[in-house]
């Protein structure tokens, strides 16, 4: 499946299923279009680097659907949680010490001990993140 589709509920559900099956999906955020995959699928994450021609030492941004999900990925102190709850969803990106040690996340984070996390404001992006569960 390829092409440009309206960001309606049916197509967002289809895109979420593509992500769950290891495929890449382009999606809108409030600032740019992103190329997304599951942070738990190393092959899909490697596909993002390949598709973008991105060097492996340049970490990707992980997107979440809710501010309270931040603590699941990063060692977020009270200041970070306060800022996340105040400004997310929106164009604020955190770089924090990471918590999860799965191999795919090693790729996402370019081997660093930090993770870059954002909660986009765009409704289609949020719904895609929620439905894909990643």
Feature locations, PLM:
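Active-site-adjacent structural elements in enzyme catalytic cores
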Residues: 1-134
């Amino acid at each position: 499946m390829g092409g440009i589709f309206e960001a309606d509920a049916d197509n967002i559900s289809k895109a979420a299923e593509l992500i769950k099956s290891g495929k890449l999906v382009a999606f809108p955020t409030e600032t740019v279009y992103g190329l997304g995959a599951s942070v738990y699928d190393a092959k899909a994450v490697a596909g993002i680097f390949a598709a973008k021609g991105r060097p492996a030492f340049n970490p990707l941004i992980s997107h979440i659907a809710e501010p309270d999900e931040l603590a699941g990925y990063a060692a977020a102190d009270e200041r970070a949680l306060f800022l996340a709850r105040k400004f997310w969803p929106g164009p604020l990106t955190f770089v924090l010490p990471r918590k999860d040690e799965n191999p795919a996340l090693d790729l996402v984070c370019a081997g660093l001990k930090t993770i870059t996390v954002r909660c986009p404001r765009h409704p289609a992006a949020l719904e895609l993140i929620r439905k894909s569960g990643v």
